[in-house]
């Protein structure tokens, strides 16, 4: 009995000794309430039952109408705070980002399939700062990106040839599928120097990144690797790892031969993986780059640059089909600047302001990540409420993009709003770099997407090329080509990492005069 009492007192003493001492800041926040929350909160699942019948951004809009622009939920056992105004976005992502909101939330799938090395997801710290600097200074700097421009041009020409062949045969093309092939091949060529083998595995990775499991939100289950979800992660990892191992081995040999002065025929030089392998061999680097770091970065580039750009481009094409006056105005600009005798080049987009405005308007209405996520790393006060440490923070970017308080006629696809200045509700020169909090398709602050320029430039180039070369004929339910006012496509959404269209965009391309023969030749 005395022994049990002594052990109990020892455990209590250890608990009191190891428990974090409350800081002056945490003591000051004790009297503050949590943001308002719906009732009831159910055992085990929290408020997840309130989200089951709608896409997340729609469910959060409904809840914000009842509980205000800042409210709290429980996703299982995880406290969650939802913000839905630009003013709140700025408080979280600018005013308090450095101290409390500089880390992203990651699911079990993201953590394991990025080898716990994702620069997009790892906690803020020395590794993140080092790799982020490496990406910006060595992988996405102007010199490297410009050097790889022929690769990007090659992939766009390949896409246009598929369109030209479809036009010549007058057969329907699944543009949803072709756009994914384009973005996947482009990223794969720039990252690895090859395009084919990794494509299908990358799609599986992206699909599971857009899904959640109860184990991600219920604390007792968090570290259990059980169930179908975890088995899928294992299966994907078992397929992906041997492929990327083979590519790394191949590129390492190419880098070695080039260092020895050999000419390696038929292989692309200067791809991102070559640079990473050179850094991995550099013993003077402040952080040693391991093979797992490289694998994680490969997944990062695929997840950031494949699905999001393809889905955004598809949304843009759907909007252009449904808004023929916008399409005609865009075509007039392309013909005026580029003409009909040569194909659009990436550098032309700097002289195509209306095309760039179409890209911005697409991201306003269809942001790649409709709900941006962060994690609270230190307790904080926002608008008189306490935000608890460890809370998941959700920013409903989709809601702000459709809010009439911040946008004039927000349900209309009107690129002109990004070219007009001075009028109330107009955007004028707003950019996509995260400093205008009513427009955050790529996030903001330290954790915003580093590839925003590459993504928007590629999207603008492909859109301008398609507008220059083809009309898209929409099919009806019986496979017939629709004409006039009937030539519309559905704008219904479905769940996914980037919330794509619910239905594939299937069209019959119609080549404009003289273009098909140039592409096919």
Curated annotation (Swiss-Prot):
It comes from the Eukaryota. Its EC number is 1.14.14.87. Its cofactor is heme. Heme binds at residue 449. It is a single-pass membrane protein. GO terms for cellular component: endoplasmic reticulum membrane; intracellular membrane-bounded organelle; membrane. GO terms for molecular function: 2-hydroxyisoflavanone synthase activity; heme binding; iron ion binding; oxidoreductase activity, acting on paired donors, with incorporation or reduction of molecular oxygen, NAD(P)H as one donor, and incorporation of one atom of oxygen. It is an enzyme of class 1 (oxidoreductase). InterPro entries: Cyt_P450 (IPR001128), Cyt_P450_CS (IPR017972), Cyt_P450_E_grp-I (IPR002401), Cyt_P450_sf (IPR036396). It catalyses: (2S)-liquiritigenin + reduced [NADPH--hemoprotein reductase] + O2 = (2R,3S)-2,4',7-trihydroxyisoflavanone + oxidized [NADPH--hemoprotein reductase] + H2O + H(+); (2S)-naringenin + reduced [NADPH--hemoprotein reductase] + O2 = 2-hydroxy-2,3-dihydrogenistein + oxidized [NADPH--hemoprotein reductase] + H2O + H(+). GO terms for biological process: isoflavonoid biosynthetic process. It is found in: Endoplasmic reticulum membrane; Microsome membrane. Keywords: Endoplasmic reticulum, Heme, Iron, Membrane, Metal-binding, Microsome, Monooxygenase, NADP, Oxidoreductase, Transmembrane, Transmembrane helix. The keyword Transport does not apply. Belongs to the cytochrome P450 family. Involved in isoflavonoid biosynthesis. Converts liquiritigenin to 2-hydroxyisoflavanone which spontaneously dehydrates to daidzein. This is 2-hydroxyisoflavanone synthase. It comes from Glycine max. The gene is IFS2.
């Amino acid at each position: 009995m005395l022994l049990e009492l002594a052990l109990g007192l020892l455990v209590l003493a250890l608990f009191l000794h190891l428990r974090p001492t409350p800081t002056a800041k945490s003591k000051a926040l004790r009297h503050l309430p949590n943001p308002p929350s719906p009732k009831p909160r159910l055992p085990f699942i929290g408020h997840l039952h309130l989200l089951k019948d709608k896409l997340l951004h729609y469910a959060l809009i409904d809840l914000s109408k009842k509980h205000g622009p800042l409210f709290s939920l429980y996703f299982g056992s995880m406290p969650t705070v939802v913000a839905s105004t630009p003013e709140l976005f700025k408080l979280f992502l600018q005013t308090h980002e450095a101290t409390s909101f500089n880390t992203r939330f990651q699911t079990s799938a993201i953590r394991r399939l990025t080898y716990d090395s994702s620069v997009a997801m790892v906690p803020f710290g020395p590794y993140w700062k080092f790799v982020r600097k490496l990406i910006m200074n060595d992988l996405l700097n102007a010199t490297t990106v410009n050097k790889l421009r022929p690769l990007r041009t090659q992939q766009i020409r390949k896409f246009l040839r598929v369109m030209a062949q479809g036009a010549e045969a007058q057969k329907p093309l699944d543009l949803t599928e072709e756009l994914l092939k384009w973005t996947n091949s482009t990223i794969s060529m720039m990252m690895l120097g090859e395009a084919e083998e990794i494509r299908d595995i990358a799609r599986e990775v992206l699909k599971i990144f857009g899904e959640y499991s109860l184990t991600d939100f219920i604390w007792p289950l968090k570290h259990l690797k059980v169930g179908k979800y975890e088995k899928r992660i294992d299966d994907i990892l078992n397929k992906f790892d041997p492929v990327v191992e083979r590519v790394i081995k191949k590129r390492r040999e190419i880098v070695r031969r080039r260092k020895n002065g050999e000419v390696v025929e038929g292989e692309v030089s200067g791809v991102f993986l070559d640079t990473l392998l050179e850094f991995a061999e550099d013993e003077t680097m402040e952080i040693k780059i391991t093979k797992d770091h490289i694998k994680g970065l490969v997944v990062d580039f695929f997840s950031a640059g494949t699905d999001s750009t393809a889905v955004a481009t598809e949304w843009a094409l759907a909007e252009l089909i449904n808004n023929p006056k916008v399409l005609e105005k865009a075509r007039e600009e392309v013909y005026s600047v580029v003409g009909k005798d040569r194909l659009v080049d990436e550098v032309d987009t700097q002289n195509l302001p209306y095309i760039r405005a179409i890209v911005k308007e697409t991201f306003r209405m269809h942001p790649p990540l409709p709900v941006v996520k962060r994690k609270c790393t230190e307790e904080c006060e926002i608008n008189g409420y306490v935000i608890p440490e460890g809370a998941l923070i959700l920013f409903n970017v989709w809601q702000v993009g459709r809010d009439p308080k911040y946008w004039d006629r927000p349900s209309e696809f009107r690129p002109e709003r990004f070219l007009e200045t001075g009028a109330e509700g107009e955007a004028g020169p707003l950019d996509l770099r995260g400093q205008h909090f009513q427009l955050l398709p790529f996030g903001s602050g330290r954790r915003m997407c580093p590839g925003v320029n590459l993504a928007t430039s590629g999207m603008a180039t492909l859109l301008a090329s398609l507008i220059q070369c083809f009309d898209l004929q929409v099919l009806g339910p019986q496979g017939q080509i629709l004409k006039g006012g009937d030539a519309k496509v559905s704008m219904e959404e479905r769940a996914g990492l980037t919330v794509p269209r619910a239905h594939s965009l299937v069209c019959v391309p119609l080549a404009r005069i003289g273009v098909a023969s140039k592409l096919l030749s």
